[in-house]
Amino acid sequence: MSCYENLVMKTQMNYSRHYSTYASGGTAVVLSKQKPLPYEEQIQEFVRRVQEAECIIVGGASGLSAAGGGDFYYSDTPSFREHFGKFADKYGFKGAFSGMMHRFSTRNEHWGYVATFLNTTQNAPIREPYLDLDRILQGKEFHILTTNQDTQFVKIYPEEKVSEIQGDHRFFQCSQCCQDETWDAVQPVADMIAAMGEGTMVPDELIPRCPHCGAEMFPWVRGYGLSLIHISEPTRH
């Protein structure tokens, strides 16, 4: 296992260990007791540093999307009900990530949910915090380093400006990792959504499969990607 793979595995285990804390809006990190600067002074300091910088490295994470209305991942919010309501009503989970961990009875239901999840982020408009950030970066040399997989940054910037270090919802990969190739997920997701209609299942023939080994695909993401196959797989005992 490479150093990077080891780091990813440890990060995922730590995230899983503290999932309930994060889901409730808390943190497992011991926060500093040092009093922050008054808010206006923080803004002034931020502006000064942006103006003086020759190049800016932007670290963008899930808070940007959540602040712009993409707050459906962890709890039963209005946006979760808007996009995932039929699944929440039928299966009882609350929060989009809980749906990713749900043990659906069939692969058809499983992929109905995965398609809905990916369709939600693939087709979301550019959220306001990203537009605010873009205004801040005007005229500056910059690069984006993001853990987000929801395609918001690549909707507003050229791909060479963005490093998506945890994957991208526009692509699939082989669930068995038979090779490193990735495939388009946008059209397959659109086809599954159209076929599913108001239901929660997709037909067998639309379940995406690796053209090399025939295994099911899963989204090209770090973390819950493996759980889509191994955790959500129906119980066989």
Language-model features, listed with the residues they occupy:
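Conserved catalytic core of sirtuin-type NAD+-dependent deacylases
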Residues: 2-236
